Swiss-Prot record:
Signal peptide: none annotated. This is UDP-3-O-acylglucosamine N-acyltransferase. InterPro entries: Hexapep, Hexapep_transf_CS, LpxD, Trimer_LpxA-like_sf, UDP_GlcNAc_AcTrfase_non-rep. Catalyzes the N-acylation of UDP-3-O-acylglucosamine using 3-hydroxyacyl-ACP as the acyl donor. Is involved in the biosynthesis of lipid A, a phosphorylated glycolipid that anchors the lipopolysaccharide to the outer membrane of the cell. PANTHER family: UDP-3-O-ACYLGLUCOSAMINE N-ACYLTRANSFERASE, UDP-3-O-ACYLGLUCOSAMINE N-ACYLTRANSFERASE 1, MITOCHONDRIAL-RELATED. It holds the Pfam family Hexapep. It comes from Polaromonas sp. (strain JS666 / ATCC BAA-500). One of its GO terms (molecular function) is N-acyltransferase activity. The active site is at 246 (proton acceptor). CDD domains: LbH_LpxD (cd03352). Keywords: Acyltransferase, Lipid A biosynthesis, Lipid biosynthesis, Lipid metabolism, Repeat, Transferase.
Length: 351
């Protein structure tokens, strides 16, 4: 299946205005990178540092910013738009919608749906899924194979739960959310009280509340709150294998890469990013627009927007061990330097 360039631009015109330069009847067979694109492919240039690849690309058409218009026109057809990366993201959505066959709503006969559950029109439920009493599934939602939806839960309209997703009792998922395979929403938070050498379980009585347009990666876990709910606001994006502890609150449109972890009762602001493998310790607060580099450990609250890194740089092992040994002596070296500065100051005063 192909798409005409004119059809692509026209379909996206209600969202983003773009200028099509070249033959509008060119048929696009595939979306591709500049490097791999062939003569029937559509690609994009999102950053000026890749400008050299533009001239070498065999793509039938390239989405570019106004600054790259002249270079793009000199090689062939192009779509000129203010934000090429955003526009290309919209093209991928259009492409999937046009090319991926959407099955008609269907409830598999092996699925268990409690009579006290409420399913709106257009809901699909896959094989061996379980939907418990009191649960509400919104219109057009898709619940894939082996999903388990607990009692009194809520899955919003047009949300998609992939295979083997668990949504525990009382948890809420908003509209148009995407939850990838194996994610667990609403398992007990990690709460225990020490008593006479033993750990006494603190029952987790809160839930998880997830806003609209949230995407949750495969095998990500979001724990239910102890007393208050764990909350993900609208537009949050979590990669695979992310751990969100109990009572955490994550602001709108914050994104976290794979293997990031947020300990209990931390508050993450809106429009933040947390790099892969980074850790935010419990009970800390991050302001809006805070960006944490990969593998960093956040040990204090960050109240000022900006980009933060807490990571010992990689090096060959011998050099790393020497630097690590020096770092352990940093306080001693600091005190020696202060003493040397004081002695030098005394000598200068006497002279």
């Amino acid at each position: 299946m192909t798409l005409r360039l004119a059809d692509i631009v026209q379909s996206l015109a209600p969202t983003v205005q773009a200028e099509l330069v070249g033959n509008p009847d060119v048929q696009i067979e595939r979306l591709s990178t500049l490097d791999a694109a062939g003569p029937h492919d559509l690609s994009f240039l999102s950053h000026p540092k890749y400008l050299a690849k533009l001239a070498q690309s065999a793509a039938a058409c390239v989405v570019v910013a106004p600054a790259a218009r002249e270079a793009a026109v000199s090689r062939g057809a192009c779509i000129v738009v203010d934000d090429p990366y955003h526009y290309f993201a919209l093209i991928t959505q259009l492409w999937k919608y046009r090319h991926v066959l959407q099955a008609a709503p269907h409830i598999h006969p092996s699925a268990f749906i409690d009579p006290a559950a409420t399913l709106a029109p257009g809901v699909s439920v896959g094989a061996f899924a379980c939907i418990s009493a009191g649960t509400v599934i919104g219109a057009g939602a898709r619940i894939a194979e082996h999903c388990v939806i607990g009692r009194d839960a809520h899955v919003g309209a047009e949300s998609r739960l992939s295979a083997r997703v668990t949504v525990a009792d009382g948890c809420y998922i908003g509209e148009r959310c995407i939850v990838h395979p194996g994610a667990v929403i609403g398992a007990d938070g990690f709460g225990f009280a020490p008593h006479q050498g033993q750990w006494i379980k603190i029952e987790q009585l809160g839930a998880v509340k997830i806003g609209n347009d949230v995407e949750i990666g495969a095998n990500t876990c979001i724990d239910r709150g102890a007393l208050q709910d764990t909350v993900l606001e609208d537009g949050v994006k979590l990669d695979n294998l992310v751990q969100i502890g109990h009572n955490v609150r994550i602001g709108k449109h914050t994104a976290m890469a794979g293997c990031a972890g947020v300990a209990g009762s931390a508050t993450i602001g809106a429009h933040c990013t947390v790099g892969g493998g980074a850790i935010v310790l419990g009970h800390l607060s991050l302001a809006d627009h805070v960006h944490i580099s990969a593998a960093s450990v956040v040990t204090r609250s960050i109240l000022k927007p900006g980009h933060y890194t807490g990571l010992f740089p990689i090096d060959d092992n011998t050099a790393w061990e020497k630097n690590a040994a020096t770092l352990k002596q940093l306080h001693v070296l600091r005190e020696r330097l202060k003493q040397a500065e004081k002695s030098l100051s005394n000598i200068q005063e006497k002279s």
